[in-house]
Amino acid sequence: MSNIDKEKAVAAALAQIEKSYGKGSVMKLGQRPNVDIESVSTGSLGLDIALGIGGIPKGRIIEIFGPESSGKTTLTLHLIAEAQKKGGTCAFIDAEHALDPAYAKKLGVNIDELIISQPDTGEQALEIADTLIRSGGIDMIIIDSVAALVPKSEIEGEMGDAQMASQARLMSQALRKLTASINRTNCITVFINQIRMKIGVMFGSPETTTGGNALKFYASVRIDIRRIGSIKDKEEVIGSQTKVKVVKNKVSPPFKTADFDIMYGSGISKEGEIIDLGVKLDIIEKSGSWFSYNSVRIGQGRENVKQYLKDNPKISNEIEKLVREKSSKVTNINFEQEEEVND
C-alpha cells in the first residue's frame, strides 16, 4: 500500500469513527485545540513549582495521602479556594463527615457556593461524584476520604464479618467508570487517602494506602504530605512544618519535594514560601538574620519578614511573580529529588 493509499485509508477510518462516536472522538495530537495542560494552583508556591505545570492538571485524577494531621484536608481546601478564585464550581464529598465550614472559610473557601454531600455508603459517594462530574458543570471535586468509602455490604453486615477486598473492588469499578467522564468534562478529581501499615514487611517501606491498587494506577498525580516539625511562638505551638513529595507525576518529572508552613487557623503560609524560595533564587538577599529586597532591608528574622510581606501585598506579589518566572527557567532550585518511591 502506497503512502497516499495509507493516508486515504486512515482518513476514511477517522471519518467512520467520528460518524459513530461524534466529532472529536479521535484526532491527530497536533489537531487538538489545546495541547498545553491547564492547571489550578495548589495554594502553595513551592508545590506549584514542584508539580512542573504551576499546579494540579485539569481533567485528571489526583491522590493526596499522608498520616493523620499531616495537612491533607488543609491542602485540598486551598485547592478549592484557588479554583473558586478562577470562577470554578467545586464539590466536596465528605465521606468522613468531618468538614469544618468555619476553617474552610478562613482558608478562603466560599462556603456559600461550595457543593457538599455527606453520603452514607461508598457506593452512594461515588455515584454522587459520577453524577456531578458527568453534568459537565463541576470544575473540581474532592472525595474525603478513600478510607471512609465503606461498601454497603460492610455497613449492612455484622461486626467482625470478613469483607475481603470489597473496598478495593468498589474503587476499581468506580475508577473505570469515572475516568472517561473526568477527561471529557475537564474536571479535577481529588481523592484524599490515609496510610496503613503492611504486616510482615521485611524489606522496603511497610506503608501503603487504603482502597487497593486501582487509584495508584489511575491517578496522574500522587502527592505524599508529611508533618516534619512544629512552629512555636515561645512555648505555644502555632503551626507545623510540612514536606510534600510528588511521588507520581504523568505531566512533568516526578519525585520533587517542597516544604511549607501550615499555620493553625490560617493554612499554608504563602509569605513563608516566598521568603524561602526568594532566598534560594537570589531574589531576596539574606545576611545574618537580616533580609533585603532590591538592596532595601525588609526585616530582621523570618517571622518579621513574613509580617512585612503580609502588610505590603504589592511587594509580596512582585516577589512571587519573580519566583515563578525564575523557577521556570532554572532546572534545579535546590528541591530535593528522590530517585525512587515506595508505595
Swiss-Prot record:
Subcellular location: Cytoplasm
Pfam families: RecA, RecA_C
SMART domains reported in the protein's UniProt record: AAA
GO terms assigned for molecular function: ATP binding; ATP hydrolysis activity; ATP-dependent DNA damage sensor activity; damaged DNA binding; single-stranded DNA binding
Residues that bind ATP: G66, P67, E68, S69, S70, G71, K72, T73
GO cellular component: cytosol
Stored PROSITE patterns: RECA_1, RECA_2, RECA_3
SUPFAM superfamilies hit by this protein: P-loop containing nucleoside triphosphate hydrolases (SSF52540), RecA protein, C-terminal domain (SSF54752)
InterPro entries, alphabetized: AAA+_ATPase, DNA_recomb/repair_RecA, DNA_recomb/repair_RecA_CS, P-loop_NTPase, RecA-like_C, RecA-like_N, RecA_ATP-bd, RecA_C_sf
Gene Ontology BP, a term: SOS response
Record keywords, A-Z: ATP-binding, Cytoplasm, DNA damage, DNA recombination, DNA repair, DNA-binding, Nucleotide-binding, SOS response
CDD domains, per the entry: RecA (cd00983)
Family the entry assigns: Belongs to the RecA family.
Physiological role: Can catalyze the hydrolysis of ATP in the presence of single-stranded DNA, the ATP-dependent uptake of single-stranded DNA by duplex DNA, and the ATP-dependent hybridization of homologous single-stranded DNAs. It interacts with LexA causing its activation and leading to its autocatalytic cleavage.
The protein, known as: Protein RecA
Lineage: Bacteria, Pseudomonadati, Pseudomonadota, Alphaproteobacteria, Rickettsiales
Gene name of this polypeptide: recA
